[in-house]
């Protein structure tokens, strides 16, 4: 591959649409290769803004604003990092010859739970939980009765667990409706899912490039209110279940096409593997790879996009704990004990300009056998404070 100098007319440019903590790590990996980075988000001083060559704060759901910026910057690759983006702008950008990663149609299918569920279950005939889509409270009540209780209720468009809830009985339906409607994102339509009494859930990081499809070690995770609080790698699972997960992940990512990393989520019950969701980009649970792999999910994503060789050397088991702010602040300060930083552990601070209760501000990372790594990652998170 030929590497040009950044800030020159012939520079290789990556535009990040979404500049949170995941985008920040992608930007850092691109910078290590001398790639020019343009970071875009809806607010100033987002994490990836701090490590980019140029940054912008725009309404990413405004088609005209997105296209105007793309034409101005002329990126070699456009990397959507969040769901709240004008999909029509991405389709138009492709028509104009710009390269969207993995492609605009894949982003369209995966940014919307309805699109990806219908694609997986009905087009690809993959095993999923039962589901219905509703747009009214009466429709939600009826769907709950048909699906059965408990059931999981989510907006078709939201991220990081926003708007998700479990209705244990019919009496919970109105509360779930209100939770969904108060979430950020588009809550005009909801998905009602059968609750699968799973043994565990995993993320299978799946990487596509010109040479084929490769998988990282499976990642186990625990979620609270739909957002991860702890992840670890590897997740111990039977060879049969892992093979099924890999086959499903390959089928769905082959169906989407393009290159880069995909975070494919599954529920596992006994030996049954249920497809859940998919993100066509690095996954929050995959931050554990910052300490467990020779090339993190972010490095793999950038290298796959550029067509560079990939390395999947696994250093050893590890865990990642999410620290969420306890306070509101326009100038957040994190207090982290020194013993969080050792030869086998560290904390990544995202540098977000504001905090609010429940906002993810940092992660702890520990390299150790799984049980001890999970304990230590959780312990470190519990010792952090903010003000």
From Swiss-Prot:
Amino-acid positions noted as binding N(1)-(5-phospho-beta-D-ribosyl)glycinamide in the UniProt annotation, renumbered to this chain: 21-22, 81, 284, 352, 359-360
Residues that, per the record, bind ATP: 113, 154, 159-164, 193-196, 201
GO molecular function, one term: magnesium ion binding
EC number: 6.3.1.21
Keyword tags: ATP-binding, Ligase, Magnesium, Metal-binding, Nucleotide-binding, Purine biosynthesis
Catalytic activity annotation: N(1)-(5-phospho-beta-D-ribosyl)glycinamide + formate + ATP = N(2)-formyl-N(1)-(5-phospho-beta-D-ribosyl)glycinamide + ADP + phosphate + H(+)
Biological or metabolic pathway of the protein: Purine metabolism; IMP biosynthesis via de novo pathway; N(2)-formyl-N(1)-(5-phospho-D-ribosyl)glycinamide from N(1)-(5-phospho-D-ribosyl)glycinamide (formate route): step 1/1
Start and end residues of each ATP-grasp domain: 118-306
One GO CC annotation: cytosol
Protein's UniProt keywords contain Acetylation: no
GO biological process, one term: 'de novo' IMP biosynthetic process
PROSITE patterns found in the cross-reference section: ATP_GRASP
Binding site for Mg(2+): 265, 277
Domain of life: Bacteria
Subunit structure: Homodimer.
Function: Involved in the de novo purine biosynthesis. Catalyzes the transfer of formate to 5-phospho-ribosyl-glycinamide (GAR), producing 5-phospho-ribosyl-N-formylglycinamide (FGAR). Formate is provided by PurU via hydrolysis of 10-formyl-tetrahydrofolate.
HAMAP family noted in UniProt: PurT (MF_01643)
Family listed: Belongs to the PurK/PurT family.
This protein's name: Formate-dependent phosphoribosylglycinamide formyltransferase
Lineage of source species: Bacteria, Pseudomonadati, Campylobacterota, Epsilonproteobacteria, Campylobacterales
């Amino acid at each position: 591959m030929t590497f040009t100098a950044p800030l020159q007319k012939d520079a290789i440019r990556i535009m990040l649409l979404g500049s949170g903590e995941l985008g920040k790590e992608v930007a850092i990996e691109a910078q290590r290769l001398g790639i020019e980075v343009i970071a875009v988000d809806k607010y100033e001083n987002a994490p990836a803004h701090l490590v980019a060559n140029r940054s912008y704060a725009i309404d990413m759901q405004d088609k005209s604003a997105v296209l105007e910026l793309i034409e101005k910057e002329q990126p070699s690759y456009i990397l959507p990092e969040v769901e709240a983006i004008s999909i029509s702008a991405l389709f138009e950008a492709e028509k104009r010859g710009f390269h969207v990663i993995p492609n605009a149609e894949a982003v369209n299918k995966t940014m919307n739970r309805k699109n990806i569920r219908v694609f997986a279950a009905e087009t690809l005939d993959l095993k999923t939980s039962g589901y219905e889509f509703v747009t009214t409270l009466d429709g939600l009540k009826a769907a709950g009765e048909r699906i059965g209780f408990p059931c999981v209720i989510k907006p078709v468009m939201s991220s990081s667990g926003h708007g998700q809830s479990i209705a244990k009985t019919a009496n919970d339906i109105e509360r779930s409706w209100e939770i969904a409607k108060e979430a950020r994102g588009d809550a005009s339509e909801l998905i009602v899912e059968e609750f699968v009494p799973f043994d565990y859930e995993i993320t299978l990081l799946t990487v596509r490039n010109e040479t084929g499809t490769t998988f990282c070690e499976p990642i186990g995770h625990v979620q609270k209110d739909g957002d991860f609080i702890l992840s670890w790698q590897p997740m111990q699972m039977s060879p049969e279940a892992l093979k099924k997960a890999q086959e499903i992940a390959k089928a769905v990512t082959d169906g989407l096409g393009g290159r880069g990393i995909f975070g494919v989520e599954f529920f596992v019950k006994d030996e049954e593997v249920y497809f859940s969701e998919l993100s066509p980009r690095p996954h929050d649970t995959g931050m554990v790879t910052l300490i467990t792999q020779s090339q993190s999910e972010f490095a793999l994503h950038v290298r796959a996009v550029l067509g560079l060789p990939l390395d999947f050397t696994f250093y050893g088991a590890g865990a990642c704990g999410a620290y969420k702010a306890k306070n509101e602040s326009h100038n957040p300060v994190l207090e982290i004990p020194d013993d969080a930083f050792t030869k086998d552990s560290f904390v990544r601070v995202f540098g977000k300009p504001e905090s609010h209760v429940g906002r993810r501000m940092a992660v702890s990372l520990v390299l150790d056998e799984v049980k001890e790594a999970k304990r230590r990652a959780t312990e470190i998170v519990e010792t952090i404070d903010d003000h």
